[in-house]
Design a protein with these regions (language model features):
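Transmembrane signal-anchor hairpin modules in multi-pass inner-membrane enzymes, especially those
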Residues: 1-99, 109, 113-132, 183-199, ...
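Loop-to-helix entry and N-terminal half of a specific, functionally important transmembrane alpha helix
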Residues: 12-17, 21, 134, 197-203, ...
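Hydrophobic alpha-helical transmembrane segments
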Residues: 74-84, 122-153, 164, 168, ...
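A membrane-periplasm/extracellular boundary helix in multi-pass inner-membrane enzymes
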Residues: 145-148, 207-212, 217, 221, ...
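TM-adjacent membrane-interface loops and short helices in multi-pass inner/ER membrane proteins
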Residues: 165, 285, 292-339, 346, ...
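Amphipathic alpha-helical repeat scaffolds of TPR domains
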Residues: 477-494, 506-536, 557-578, 599-609, ...
Length: 759
């Protein structure tokens, strides 16, 4: 039985809804690449069927206000890419984000296909499927959060599921919880009953937002939901929904009471020990994350003023951020201040695509709201009952999504849901008064045989097929294959199969051809693997030289690329282990790095290490002090200063800096150094740091009984009964001579005689 094209498109759309489940550890950036690749394959197959339907007259391309704004936005981001700082990166993006013009165009194409083929009933079927899919998705996320493992995704400290990021999960469930609310209201309209099964899904999916601890998601969902209930309470169009009005008023009052109670108890153990409530009550512009986002938005605005019309180009926020970096971000978030996104979607759009990009982006929301407001006005018309409620929910979805995006950026799951919802809204607005159609192919009057229409149809099909085939092979499948090969190369490096790794690397570069975005992913991926998994040796010289050469080629296009320059310096440092002349090259590269990012602590830390290796101790000290002026919590800088004073035979200052290095988590490589620093900390009774040090020592020498004895005593000093007993017993297991002392120690612990525990 031959399936109609529309039916096939419907099932392909459902297949798109399952792409958020796709995670593969065999690709570089496992939570990103497979989802984006499969979605693009599905959309391009859908596009071919769609063109076939148009040619056969089974559907028409309808243009209303919303679809026109999307076309304008698609054009603006292309112009911005051409005028930006790196067209390749703007157009194709990389493995880490898989967005760019090419990625966004796929979502816009997805919108046009579903908006022109499906009617409202089709969309309702898709939405129902999506709500149940998301409910299952949330269930699996909870299993993973509880310690389970599903596929390659294992337990995470926060609820994130297959997204890999709690914030991504939050926005996904903003859409789905409110879609469930849409079906709840539809059922309510029919039954007039407050409770129906959809309410359970609304509550369940809303709770997942709060369990994830995503504050932007909480705010987005909260304001979207608030918009619905206040509209039901105060809007004249809601006057016939008396029961909903009462329920909304009750919900509003209950919500105010709940928030008031939670915030008044924010300093109590009840709130502090509940992760979701603690995250909720920590919402503040003074919170480090909030302050960092605000500073990044200021940087985005400063960058916009440099390129006000079409911006720096999509995906090119990183160079803008580096050039206009605000050092205050380091003080606020010392461990996470390097942004390749503004973490504020509107401001990022402004910086990367300029004022024209931002206006066209905002017009998408304006057009969608205009359609929904027009839909509300149909409430009193025959066969239009309930339109006010339904439009209200979709307005809330757009509000929640937009608010959440003020705190983050878009990604696969958010784009998928956004353009799916836009497709539905577009169909709601498809009336003769609000839309126009692309004319069908002309038909002759039958008196003469006109082959032009048929030839035109055939030509359109051939061109479409060729374009889609080329796009799939070169722009979709090839990047996926290269992503997999990056991981294969990294695995070879971890096995110390260096010859095979080098051959795989060269083969991957050859496959990438002239696509700079792919070459950059390959080079950065392998350089990061060198930093994390490879012990430098002279037989790696050809590999390292090749990496440096490729890095130099990429830097001709992106001289501002901090990561490339940093990696180059690290590789040169590796080579200096067998070629002392390379240390000077590393120094020059590090000095170039200072010009790119003078306010980055890592920049000066690298220089401090290089100067120390060159035995230029005064310069090393100067750079280490610069690091601490930028980030007073940098453990390595304290360690370098400790080495400096130790070299100067100034033991008092050396010990002071070594102790600070320990407090901020420096990983010492020498067991004796750890013991000496721990002894210094005993005088200050800093048992928390002592415990961290002795745990490091166990990793260095797991058979040293004395370390277990000291660790047991340290845990005893902080009244951690369970761990004190555990390590005392371990000491006795390793050396039976400690058995009696261990039993005496445990007796002290059991009796609560903490003061008698020796240091």
């Amino acid at each position: 039985m031959k399936l109609p094209y529309k039916t096939i498109l419907f099932y392909l759309t459902l297949a798109c809804l399952f792409t958020p489940f796709l995670v593969s550890s065999n690709t570089y950036f496992p939570f990103i690449v497979t989802k984006a690749t499969v979605f693009r394959v599905l959309v391009e197959i859908m596009a071919l069927l769609w063109v076939l339907m148009i040619v056969k007259g089974e559907t028409k391309l309808k243009l209303n206000k919303l679809s026109k704004t999307l076309l304008i936005y698609a054009l603006i981001i292309l112009i911005s890419a051409f005028l930006g700082v790196n067209f390749y990166w703007s157009f194709f993006s990389g493995n880490e984000r898989m967005e760019g013009v090419f990625g966004i165009w796929h979502f816009i194409l997805f919108f046009f296909i579903i908006a022109s083929v499906f009617d409202l009933n089709d969309f309702k079927k898709v939405f129902k499927a999506e709500v149940f899919i998301s409910a299952f998705y949330g269930f699996l996320a909870l299993i993973i959060y509880a310690g389970g493992r599903i596929g390659v995704v294992s337990a995470t400290p926060r609820l994130s599921g297959f997204t890999g990021n709690p914030s991504y999960l939050g926005i996904y469930f903003i859409f789905n919880s409110l879609l469930a609310l849409y079906f709840y209201l539809e059922e309510f309209k029919l039954s007039k009953k407050i409770f129906n099964p959809w309410l359970l899904l609304v509550v369940y999916e809303a709770l997942l937002i709060f369990i994830s601890g995503t504050r932007g998601g909480m705010i987005g969902f909260g304001l979207g939901f608030l918009y619905i209930i206040t509209s039901l309470i105060f809007s004249q169009r809601a006057k016939e929904y008396h029961l909903l009005k009462k329920l909304s008023l009750f919900t509003l009052i209950a919500g105010i009471v709940f928030l008031g109670a939670v915030f008044s108890l924010k300093n109590t153990s009840f709130v502090k020990n509940n992760f979701a409530l603690e995250r909720l009550t920590s919402i503040s512009l003074k919170d480090p994350t909030g302050m960092a986002r605000l500073l990044s938005a200021q940087t985005a605005f400063k960058s916009f003023k440099e390129k006000p019309f079409f911006g720096w180009g999509p995906e090119n926020y990183e160079p803008a951020y580096l050039k206009n970096f605000n050092p205050e971000v380091v003080k606020v978030l010392p461990g996470d201040f390097y942004f390749d996104r503004a973490h504020n979607k509107p401001m990022e759009v402004l910086a990367t695509t300029g004022i024209f990009g931002l206006i066209s982006y905002l017009l998408i929301f304006v057009a969608a709201f205009w359609i929904l407001e027009q839909t509300k006005k149909k409430e009193g018309l025959p066969a239009q009952a309930g339109q006010f409620l339904f439009a209200l929910v979709f307005e809330a979805i757009l509000i929640g999504y937009f608010i959440q995006n003020v705190f983050i950026f878009d990604f696969h799951e958010s784009y998928l849901m956004f353009f799916l919802v836009l497709g539905f809204i577009s169909v709601m607005g498809d009336t003769p008064e609000t839309s126009s159609e692309i004319p069908r192919f002309a038909r002759n009057d039958g008196r003469t045989k006109d082959f032009v229409p048929e030839l035109t149809k055939g030509l359109i099909l051939i061109v479409s097929f060729c374009l889609i085939f080329y796009s799939l092979s070169q722009f979709v499948i090839k990047p996926y294959s290269i992503s997999k090969n990056i991981i294969t190369t990294i695995k070879a490096l971890t096995r110390q199969d260096y010859d095979n790794a080098y051959q795989l690397y060269k083969k991957n570069l050859y496959s990438a051809g002239q696509f700079e975005n792919l070459r950059k992913d390959i080079v950065i991926g392998i350089e990061n693997a060198f930093a994390n998994y490879v012990t430098p040796s002279e037989n790696l010289k050809p590999f390292i030289d090749d990496l440096i050469s490729e890095t130099d080629k990429l830097l001709q296009r992106e001289p501002w690329n901090y990561r490339l320059v940093m990696n180059k310096a690290q590789l040169q440092l590796n080579e200096s282990m067998w070629d002392k002349e390379k240390i000077k090259e590393a120094e020059k590269t590090a000095e170039d790095l200072v010009k790119i990012a003078p306010a980055f602590p890592q920049t000066h830390l690298l220089l401090a290490k290089i100067y120390f290796l060159e035995n230029d101790l005064e310069k090393a000290k100067e750079e280490a002090e610069k690091v601490l002026s930028l980030n007073p919590q940098d453990s390595t800088a304290y360690y370098i200063l400790g080495l400096y004073y130790s070299n100067k035979k100034d033991n008092e200052n050396a010990n002071k800096y070594f102790v600070q290095a320990a407090r901020y988590g420096y990983l010492f490589k020498d067991k004796n150094s750890i013991v000496n620093i721990a002894n210094l900390l005993i005088q200050e009774k800093d048992y928390e740091t002592i415990i961290k040090l002795y745990l490091q020592a166990i990793n260095l020498d797991s058979k040293d009984t004395e370390i277990y004895v000291h660790l047991a005593a340290a845990y005893g000093k902080i009244h951690d009964k369970e761990k004190a007993i555990y390590y005392a017993q371990k000491a006795a297991e390793l050396d039976p001579n400690f058995k009696q002392a261990s039993e005496n120690f445990i007796q002290l612990i059991e009796n609560g005689e903490w003061d008698k525990i020796p240091d």
